[in-house]
Amino acid sequence: MGFCIPSRSKMLKRGSRKSSSILARRPTPKKMNIVTDLENRLKKNSYIENTNQGNILMDSIFVSTMPVETLFGSYITDDSDDYELKDLLNVTYNIKPVIVPDIKLDAVLDRDGNFRPADCFLVKLKHRDGFTKGALYLGHSAGFTATICLKNEGVSGLYIPGTSVIRSNICQGDTIVSRSSRGVQFLPQIGGEAIFLIVSLCPTKKLVETGFVIPEISSNDNAKIAARILSEKRKDTIAHINTLIQYRQQLELAYYNSCMLTEFLHYCNSYAGTIKESLLKETIQKDINITHTNITTLLNETAKVIKLVKSLVDKEDTDIVNNFITKEIKNRDKIVNCLSLSNLDFRL
Protein backbone atom coordinates (compact mmCIF):
# COMPACT_ATOMS: atom_id res chain seq x y z
CA MET A 1 0.00 0.00 0.00
CA GLY A 2 1.43 3.40 -0.91
CA PHE A 3 0.93 6.77 0.71
CA CYS A 4 0.58 10.03 -1.20
CA ILE A 5 2.02 13.10 0.52
CA PRO A 6 1.14 16.48 -1.10
CA SER A 7 4.11 18.50 -2.32
CA ARG A 8 5.23 21.48 -0.28
CA SER A 9 4.13 24.01 -2.95
CA LYS A 10 0.59 22.62 -3.11
CA MET A 11 0.30 22.59 0.64
CA LEU A 12 1.39 26.23 0.82
CA LYS A 13 -1.04 27.20 -1.94
CA ARG A 14 -3.96 25.59 -0.14
CA GLY A 15 -2.98 27.25 3.09
CA SER A 16 -2.65 30.70 1.50
CA ARG A 17 -6.30 30.79 0.51
CA LYS A 18 -7.43 30.92 4.12
CA SER A 19 -4.45 32.60 5.69
CA SER A 20 -6.53 35.42 7.13
CA SER A 21 -9.09 33.17 8.74
CA ILE A 22 -6.91 30.46 10.29
CA LEU A 23 -4.08 32.46 11.87
CA ALA A 24 -5.68 32.31 15.30
CA ARG A 25 -7.25 28.90 14.81
CA ARG A 26 -5.61 25.63 15.93
CA PRO A 27 -5.41 22.80 13.34
CA THR A 28 -8.40 20.51 13.40
CA PRO A 29 -7.96 17.24 15.32
CA LYS A 30 -8.81 15.28 12.18
CA LYS A 31 -5.79 16.61 10.25
CA MET A 32 -3.48 16.08 13.22
CA ASN A 33 -4.66 12.47 13.59
CA ILE A 34 -4.07 11.75 9.90
CA VAL A 35 -0.52 13.09 10.02
CA THR A 36 0.28 11.26 13.26
CA ASP A 37 -1.12 7.99 11.97
CA LEU A 38 0.86 8.29 8.75
CA GLU A 39 4.10 9.00 10.60
CA ASN A 40 3.56 6.09 12.96
CA ARG A 41 2.81 3.69 10.13
CA LEU A 42 5.91 4.76 8.21
CA LYS A 43 8.03 4.05 11.28
CA LYS A 44 6.70 0.50 11.60
CA ASN A 45 8.38 -2.64 10.32
CA SER A 46 7.48 -4.37 7.10
CA TYR A 47 7.66 -8.15 7.25
CA ILE A 48 6.72 -8.83 3.61
CA GLU A 49 8.79 -7.84 0.58
CA ASN A 50 6.83 -7.16 -2.61
CA THR A 51 8.74 -8.50 -5.64
CA ASN A 52 8.02 -9.52 -9.22
CA GLN A 53 7.77 -13.09 -7.93
CA GLY A 54 5.10 -12.07 -5.44
CA ASN A 55 5.05 -11.49 -1.68
CA ILE A 56 8.11 -12.92 0.06
CA LEU A 57 8.45 -13.40 3.81
CA MET A 58 11.44 -11.37 4.95
CA ASP A 59 14.32 -12.90 6.89
CA SER A 60 15.41 -9.70 8.63
CA ILE A 61 15.89 -8.99 12.34
CA PHE A 62 14.11 -5.89 13.63
CA VAL A 63 15.63 -4.28 16.74
CA SER A 64 14.01 -1.42 18.66
CA THR A 65 13.04 -0.26 22.16
CA MET A 66 9.65 0.10 23.84
CA PRO A 67 8.40 2.03 26.93
CA VAL A 68 7.61 -1.22 28.73
CA GLU A 69 6.98 0.29 32.16
CA THR A 70 4.12 2.33 30.70
CA LEU A 71 2.71 -0.43 28.50
CA PHE A 72 3.30 -3.54 30.59
CA GLY A 73 3.76 -2.31 34.16
CA SER A 74 1.32 -4.84 35.64
CA TYR A 75 3.27 -7.75 34.16
CA ILE A 76 6.57 -6.43 35.51
CA THR A 77 5.32 -6.15 39.11
CA ASP A 78 3.34 -9.41 39.01
CA ASP A 79 4.77 -11.73 41.70
CA SER A 80 2.36 -14.60 41.11
CA ASP A 81 3.77 -18.12 41.11
CA ASP A 82 1.54 -19.51 38.36
CA TYR A 83 4.43 -19.96 35.94
CA GLU A 84 5.08 -23.44 34.59
CA LEU A 85 8.63 -24.64 35.19
CA LYS A 86 10.38 -26.17 32.18
CA ASP A 87 13.45 -28.02 33.41
CA LEU A 88 15.05 -30.25 30.79
CA LEU A 89 18.60 -31.43 30.09
CA ASN A 90 19.96 -28.18 28.64
CA VAL A 91 16.98 -25.88 29.22
CA THR A 92 15.47 -24.28 32.33
CA TYR A 93 12.89 -21.50 32.32
CA ASN A 94 9.45 -20.52 33.63
CA ILE A 95 6.58 -19.68 31.27
CA LYS A 96 2.90 -18.78 31.33
CA PRO A 97 0.37 -17.55 28.73
CA VAL A 98 -0.99 -14.02 29.13
CA ILE A 99 -3.56 -11.86 27.38
CA VAL A 100 -2.24 -8.53 26.11
CA PRO A 101 -4.50 -5.96 24.37
CA ASP A 102 -3.52 -5.48 20.73
CA ILE A 103 -3.21 -1.72 21.23
CA LYS A 104 -0.23 -2.29 23.55
CA LEU A 105 1.52 -4.32 20.84
CA ASP A 106 1.16 -1.73 18.09
CA ALA A 107 4.92 -1.10 17.96
CA VAL A 108 5.69 -4.65 16.79
CA LEU A 109 2.90 -4.86 14.20
CA ASP A 110 3.75 -4.32 10.53
CA ARG A 111 2.74 -1.22 8.61
CA ASP A 112 0.86 -3.21 5.96
CA GLY A 113 -1.43 -5.11 8.32
CA ASN A 114 -0.17 -8.50 7.12
CA PHE A 115 0.39 -9.90 10.62
CA ARG A 116 -1.60 -9.92 13.83
CA PRO A 117 -0.77 -10.82 17.45
CA ALA A 118 -1.85 -14.37 18.23
CA ASP A 119 -0.44 -15.82 21.45
CA CYS A 120 1.50 -14.02 24.18
CA PHE A 121 3.69 -15.57 26.87
CA LEU A 122 5.74 -14.37 29.82
CA VAL A 123 9.10 -16.07 30.21
CA LYS A 124 10.85 -15.71 33.57
CA LEU A 125 14.53 -16.48 34.06
CA LYS A 126 16.18 -16.78 37.46
CA HIS A 127 19.85 -17.18 38.34
CA ARG A 128 21.19 -20.32 36.56
CA ASP A 129 18.14 -20.54 34.21
CA GLY A 130 18.49 -20.40 30.44
CA PHE A 131 19.47 -22.43 27.40
CA THR A 132 22.87 -24.02 26.94
CA LYS A 133 21.57 -25.68 23.77
CA GLY A 134 18.46 -25.40 21.64
CA ALA A 135 15.95 -22.56 21.53
CA LEU A 136 12.38 -21.62 22.41
CA TYR A 137 9.95 -21.98 19.50
CA LEU A 138 6.53 -20.35 19.78
CA GLY A 139 3.92 -19.31 17.25
CA HIS A 140 3.24 -19.85 13.56
CA SER A 141 6.11 -21.25 11.49
CA ALA A 142 5.33 -18.68 8.77
CA GLY A 143 5.12 -15.82 11.24
CA PHE A 144 7.36 -13.72 13.44
CA THR A 145 8.23 -13.67 17.13
CA ALA A 146 8.65 -10.44 19.09
CA THR A 147 10.88 -10.78 22.15
CA ILE A 148 10.45 -7.85 24.57
CA CYS A 149 12.52 -7.44 27.74
CA LEU A 150 10.20 -6.27 30.52
CA LYS A 151 12.62 -6.63 33.41
CA ASN A 152 16.27 -7.52 33.96
CA GLU A 153 17.84 -7.39 37.40
CA GLY A 154 20.80 -9.55 36.42
CA VAL A 155 22.89 -10.24 33.34
CA SER A 156 20.50 -11.62 30.73
CA GLY A 157 21.48 -12.37 27.14
CA LEU A 158 19.90 -13.92 24.09
CA TYR A 159 20.80 -15.25 20.67
CA ILE A 160 18.65 -15.50 17.55
CA PRO A 161 19.83 -18.85 16.09
CA GLY A 162 21.44 -18.69 12.67
CA THR A 163 21.93 -14.92 12.76
CA SER A 164 24.61 -12.52 13.98
CA VAL A 165 22.28 -11.17 16.70
CA ILE A 166 23.93 -12.06 20.02
CA ARG A 167 23.19 -9.82 23.00
CA SER A 168 25.35 -10.43 26.07
CA ASN A 169 23.15 -8.26 28.31
CA ILE A 170 19.65 -7.18 27.33
CA CYS A 171 18.28 -3.92 28.74
CA GLN A 172 14.72 -3.23 29.83
CA GLY A 173 12.63 -2.25 26.81
CA ASP A 174 14.86 -3.92 24.21
CA THR A 175 12.70 -5.50 21.50
CA ILE A 176 13.76 -8.00 18.84
CA VAL A 177 11.44 -9.29 16.11
CA SER A 178 12.61 -12.34 14.15
CA ARG A 179 11.25 -15.23 12.14
CA SER A 180 9.42 -17.68 14.41
CA SER A 181 11.12 -20.61 12.68
CA ARG A 182 14.46 -19.41 14.08
CA GLY A 183 13.39 -19.53 17.70
CA VAL A 184 14.99 -17.61 20.56
CA GLN A 185 17.84 -18.88 22.71
CA PHE A 186 18.02 -17.28 26.15
CA LEU A 187 21.60 -17.49 27.39
CA PRO A 188 22.20 -18.68 30.98
CA GLN A 189 21.00 -16.00 33.40
CA ILE A 190 23.58 -14.51 35.77
CA GLY A 191 22.32 -12.90 38.95
CA GLY A 192 18.84 -11.49 39.42
CA GLU A 193 15.54 -12.17 37.71
CA ALA A 194 14.57 -11.36 34.12
CA ILE A 195 11.12 -11.34 32.51
CA PHE A 196 10.44 -11.38 28.76
CA LEU A 197 7.19 -10.94 26.87
CA ILE A 198 7.03 -13.22 23.83
CA VAL A 199 4.49 -12.25 21.17
CA SER A 200 3.62 -14.56 18.29
CA LEU A 201 2.75 -12.67 15.10
CA CYS A 202 0.69 -14.75 12.65
CA PRO A 203 -0.29 -14.03 9.01
CA THR A 204 -3.64 -12.30 8.64
CA LYS A 205 -6.46 -13.66 6.48
CA LYS A 206 -5.70 -10.92 3.95
CA LEU A 207 -2.11 -12.11 3.53
CA VAL A 208 -3.08 -15.78 3.34
CA GLU A 209 -5.63 -15.06 0.62
CA THR A 210 -3.12 -12.95 -1.31
CA GLY A 211 -0.49 -15.65 -0.98
CA PHE A 212 3.18 -15.39 -0.06
CA VAL A 213 6.46 -17.27 -0.43
CA ILE A 214 8.35 -18.62 2.59
CA PRO A 215 12.06 -18.67 1.70
CA GLU A 216 14.62 -20.82 3.46
CA ILE A 217 16.20 -19.03 6.41
CA SER A 218 19.88 -18.16 6.21
CA SER A 219 22.49 -19.44 8.63
CA ASN A 220 25.57 -17.86 10.22
CA ASP A 221 27.95 -20.60 11.38
CA ASN A 222 30.42 -18.20 12.99
CA ALA A 223 27.64 -16.74 15.13
CA LYS A 224 26.59 -20.24 16.21
CA ILE A 225 30.11 -20.93 17.45
CA ALA A 226 30.28 -17.55 19.22
CA ALA A 227 26.93 -18.16 20.92
CA ARG A 228 28.01 -21.61 22.10
CA ILE A 229 31.27 -20.22 23.51
CA LEU A 230 29.40 -17.41 25.28
CA SER A 231 26.89 -19.89 26.72
CA GLU A 232 29.66 -22.10 28.13
CA LYS A 233 31.43 -19.05 29.54
CA ARG A 234 28.26 -18.00 31.35
CA LYS A 235 27.83 -21.52 32.76
CA ASP A 236 31.34 -21.33 34.22
CA THR A 237 30.66 -17.85 35.60
CA ILE A 238 27.46 -19.04 37.30
CA ALA A 239 29.29 -22.01 38.86
CA HIS A 240 32.02 -19.74 40.27
CA ILE A 241 29.48 -17.23 41.60
CA ASN A 242 27.60 -20.05 43.35
CA THR A 243 30.88 -21.23 44.90
CA LEU A 244 31.67 -17.68 46.01
CA ILE A 245 28.26 -17.39 47.70
CA GLN A 246 28.82 -20.74 49.43
CA TYR A 247 32.23 -19.65 50.71
CA ARG A 248 30.79 -16.38 51.96
CA GLN A 249 28.09 -18.18 53.92
CA GLN A 250 30.66 -20.58 55.38
CA LEU A 251 32.88 -17.68 56.37
CA GLU A 252 30.07 -15.94 58.19
CA LEU A 253 29.30 -19.13 60.06
CA ALA A 254 32.99 -19.55 60.93
CA TYR A 255 33.19 -15.97 62.23
CA TYR A 256 30.06 -16.57 64.27
CA ASN A 257 31.52 -19.73 65.83
CA SER A 258 34.78 -17.93 66.54
CA CYS A 259 32.94 -15.11 68.35
CA MET A 260 30.92 -17.56 70.44
CA LEU A 261 33.97 -19.64 71.41
CA THR A 262 36.02 -16.55 72.27
CA GLU A 263 33.20 -15.24 74.45
CA PHE A 264 32.92 -18.62 76.17
CA LEU A 265 36.68 -18.71 76.83
CA HIS A 266 36.52 -15.19 78.27
CA TYR A 267 33.72 -16.37 80.56
CA CYS A 268 35.85 -19.31 81.74
CA ASN A 269 38.83 -17.05 82.44
CA SER A 270 36.66 -14.59 84.37
CA TYR A 271 35.49 -17.36 86.67
CA ALA A 272 38.79 -19.19 86.87
CA GLY A 273 38.38 -19.62 90.61
CA THR A 274 35.07 -21.40 90.15
CA ILE A 275 35.70 -23.27 86.91
CA LYS A 276 38.86 -25.31 87.43
CA GLU A 277 38.52 -27.61 84.46
CA SER A 278 41.64 -26.58 82.54
CA LEU A 279 40.85 -29.32 80.02
CA LEU A 280 37.66 -27.48 79.09
CA LYS A 281 39.58 -24.28 78.39
CA GLU A 282 42.14 -26.19 76.35
CA THR A 283 39.36 -27.74 74.29
CA ILE A 284 37.78 -24.34 73.68
CA GLN A 285 41.10 -22.84 72.63
CA LYS A 286 41.71 -25.78 70.32
CA ASP A 287 38.31 -25.23 68.68
CA ILE A 288 39.11 -21.53 68.27
CA ASN A 289 42.39 -22.37 66.55
CA ILE A 290 40.63 -24.81 64.19
CA THR A 291 38.02 -22.16 63.37
CA HIS A 292 40.69 -19.58 62.60
CA THR A 293 42.47 -22.10 60.35
CA ASN A 294 39.21 -22.72 58.50
CA ILE A 295 38.71 -18.98 58.08
CA THR A 296 42.21 -18.57 56.63
CA THR A 297 41.66 -21.46 54.21
CA LEU A 298 38.29 -20.09 53.12
CA LEU A 299 39.77 -16.64 52.61
CA ASN A 300 42.48 -18.04 50.33
CA GLU A 301 39.97 -20.08 48.33
CA THR A 302 37.63 -17.10 48.11
CA ALA A 303 40.41 -14.91 46.71
CA LYS A 304 41.04 -17.47 43.97
CA VAL A 305 37.36 -17.65 42.99
CA ILE A 306 37.03 -13.85 42.99
CA LYS A 307 39.96 -13.69 40.57
CA LEU A 308 38.24 -16.22 38.29
CA VAL A 309 34.91 -14.37 38.36
CA LYS A 310 36.66 -11.08 37.60
CA SER A 311 38.18 -12.63 34.49
CA LEU A 312 34.78 -13.90 33.27
CA VAL A 313 32.40 -11.03 34.11
CA ASP A 314 32.32 -7.95 31.90
CA LYS A 315 33.43 -4.84 33.75
CA GLU A 316 30.08 -3.09 33.27
CA ASP A 317 28.29 -6.05 34.90
CA THR A 318 30.37 -6.28 38.10
CA ASP A 319 28.00 -4.12 40.16
CA ILE A 320 25.08 -6.40 39.22
CA VAL A 321 27.03 -9.49 40.30
CA ASN A 322 28.22 -7.82 43.52
CA ASN A 323 24.67 -6.86 44.48
CA PHE A 324 23.40 -10.36 43.75
CA ILE A 325 26.09 -11.99 45.92
CA THR A 326 25.33 -9.60 48.78
CA LYS A 327 21.59 -10.43 48.64
CA GLU A 328 22.35 -14.13 48.87
CA ILE A 329 23.74 -13.91 52.44
CA LYS A 330 21.82 -16.34 54.62
CA ASN A 331 22.98 -15.09 58.04
CA ARG A 332 21.39 -11.73 58.73
CA ASP A 333 22.84 -10.99 62.17
CA LYS A 334 24.16 -7.42 61.97
CA ILE A 335 26.96 -8.02 64.47
CA VAL A 336 28.19 -11.09 62.62
CA ASN A 337 28.05 -9.32 59.29
CA CYS A 338 29.91 -6.36 60.74
CA LEU A 339 32.67 -8.60 62.07
CA SER A 340 32.98 -10.67 58.92
CA LEU A 341 32.46 -8.17 56.14
CA SER A 342 34.80 -5.62 57.69
CA ASN A 343 37.59 -8.17 57.26
CA LEU A 344 36.54 -9.54 53.87
CA ASP A 345 36.36 -7.89 50.48
CA PHE A 346 34.01 -9.79 48.21
CA ARG A 347 33.60 -7.08 45.63
CA LEU A 348 34.89 -8.01 42.19
Swiss-Prot record:
Transmembrane segments: none annotated. Pfam families: Pox_F11 (PF04943). Induction: Expressed in the late phase of the viral replicative cycle. Keywords: Late protein. InterPro entries: Poxvirus_F11. The keyword Ligase does not apply. Belongs to the orthopoxvirus OPG055 family. Stimulates increases in peripheral microtubule dynamics and may increase the motility of the infected cells, contributing to cell-to-cell spread of the virus. Seems to inhibit the signaling via the GTPase RHOA and DIAPH1/mDia. This is Protein OPG055. It comes from Vaccinia virus (strain Western Reserve) (VACV). The gene is OPG055.
